[in-house]
Amino acid sequence: MSAPVLELLPAVDISEGYAVRPVGGTLSGGEQRLDPVEAALTWVKAGARWIHLVDLDLAFGRGTNTEVLAEVVAAVRAENAWMTGSAPVRVQVSGGVRNAESLERALSLNPDRVNVTSAALADSSWLEGVLAHYADSDLLALGLDARYNTERGWVTVARGTDWSGPDLAEALAWLESAGVRRYIVTDVSKDGSLAGPGAELLDEVLAQTACRVVASGGVASLADLVKLRSMVPYGLEGVVLGKALYVGNFSFEQALEVAGSR
């Protein structure tokens, strides 16, 4: 029996037309602006099988970068055309997809997967209809953002807003019945913090769902990837990697080795 493989999804965050990446090893280390296409192709050439492409401005309600995201997706597709003997690199689009307009915008990019934010839970009738429409497709994932509350336990939230939704167990039960096939799970207290990948939340989700799960946020070290890989037999599929890669805590090649991808 082969050892489990943890899928790695390096993140490319887009803001004001640029790929933005943190610099320095602290939370206040500043930001570097890069060409978005070059940023994405760096990971493709390093061996990534997925790119997690995020419109930060749409996520935080300060505009969109649709044209830039379209250029990145097209560049990855073009790079795939030159690659032989290996599976094509796929693109997961994320950031602010919470209603019909934003979903249509995301789908217009022709991505391989769209991550619908947990804020969509606020409009359950729309979300239920969308999940039913794509029930036989692997096109949609549900971004499950949560924060621990001392009185309620894990509670769903939407980053960039004051919205607080149902408790985790209630949300999972409803989403399962609505037809969710994959979750992108984030402990929002860990995201961007280099404080660990939120294993407690992941354990809770994996214990309550048979859907595929991708972890996001907080990874700081190769040891974190070892921990996440140990969860693969229990339903964890992959992890979105961001700050730890960009500030140099480890290389993508090292991450692939630990994840079992090479």
Model features per residue range: what roles?
Residues 7-11, 50, 88-92, 112-115, ...:
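Structural preference for beta-strand elements that scaffold enzyme active sites
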Residues 10, 62-92, 128-145, 196-222:
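Alpha-helix-loop-beta-strand connector modules within alpha/beta enzyme cores
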Residues 13, 43, 51, 106, ...:
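Conserved, mostly hydrophobic/aromatic
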Residues 15-27, 107-191:
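Conserved anion-binding
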Residues 25-45:
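Short catalytic helix/loop segments, enriched in acidic residues and glycine
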Residues 50-68, 118, 185-194:
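Glycine-rich, proline-tolerant flexible connector loops at the mouths of alpha/beta enzymes
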Residues 90-114, 200-235, 250, 254-255:
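Catalytic cores of alpha/beta
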Residues 125-134, 229-232, 236-241, 245-262:
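C-terminal helical cap(s) of enzyme catalytic domains, especially alpha/beta-barrels
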